[in-house]
From Swiss-Prot:
This is 2-C-methyl-D-erythritol 4-phosphate cytidylyltransferase. Its EC number is 2.7.7.60. Belongs to the IspD/TarI cytidylyltransferase family. IspD subfamily. The gene is ispD. GO terms for biological process: isopentenyl diphosphate biosynthetic process, methylerythritol 4-phosphate pathway. The record marks R174, K230 as: Positions MEP for the nucleophilic attack.
């Protein structure tokens, strides 16, 4: 499920940040140490087959082929027995690290291998339908949002808040609400600092943007494509297949 964010006014005070030049390297980080139990499969969901290769292979293809991404770092489970069988594992732009028990720990492990003067572009392993145009939009947004930004989608559906019985408690105003997507793009040293700080403080860190929010920084929101779905449930595989086939047509 995507995180839902509420947009803030651009006139609000921003915490001062140390900015990275746009010419800095862009390092893609893929946290892939999770199990993905909601798929009900016998293997991590990122290795489920999708149009002749795994979900993760499709995701890596999208990142490795982008000309502005200089390196891709994948955080793996210590007992991962599938990754090194992927053709992408031998790509010269790709590195691996051992991830942690939570997404944030895996991202931190990868950040430790990224240059300080770079931009970290963090993308879910199970989002195989990412388009190069969305990466381009996010990288271009560094001019407007030098503190970092994420791909997101405005909430279009009516939102309901439930009570403990699974009944509707209230209708939530959807004005300024966005679904958080990935990639999420931040200056590497800044993300490393605040991700570690948020974890040390016991803050709830569900994505990279939430660590920046914890530090008082308001990341930008960049409207992304609706087909950039996260494969979370079995039905999502059919939808991802449809989107990938349409992109190749």
């Amino acid at each position: 499920m995507d995180i839902v964010l509420e947009a803030t006014s651009q006139t609000e005070t921003q915490v001062a940040v140390q900015l990275e030049p746009l010419s800095s390297n862009v390092v893609a980080i893929v946290p892939a140490a999770g199990i993905g139990s909601r798929m009900g499969a016998g293997k991590p969901k990122q290795y489920l087959p999708l149009l002749g290769q795994s979900i993760l292979a499709h995701t890596l293809d999208k990142l490795l082929s982008h000309p502005l991404i200089s390196q891709v770092i994948v955080a793996l489970h210590p007992e991962d027995a599938d990754f090194y069988a992927l053709p992408q594992a031998k790509h010269p732009k790709l590195k691996t690290v051992i991830g942690g028990s939570e997404r944030a720990n895996s991202v931190l492990a990868a950040l430790d291998k990224a240059p300080d003067n770079s931009w970290a572009l963090v993308h879910d392993a199970a989002r195989p339908c990412l388009m190069a145009s969305d990466i381009d939009k996010l990288l271009t947004s560094r001019v407007q949002f030098p503190q970092g930004a994420i791909l997101a989608m405005p909430v279009r559906d009516t939102m309901k808040r439930a009570n403990s019985l699974g009944e509707i408690n209230s209708t939530v105003c959807r004005d300024n609400l966005w679904h958080a997507l990935t990639p999420q793009l931040f200056p590497t040293s800044l993300l490393r600092l605040h991700l570690q700080g948020a974890l040390n403080a016991g803050a709830v860190v569900t994505d990279e943007a939430s660590a920046m929010e914890w530090a008082g920084i308001s990341p930008g929101l960049v409207a992304g494509r609706a087909d950039n779905i996260k494969v979370t449930h079995p039905d999502d595989l059919e939808l991802a297949e449809l989107f990938l086939m349409r992109a190749k047509a």
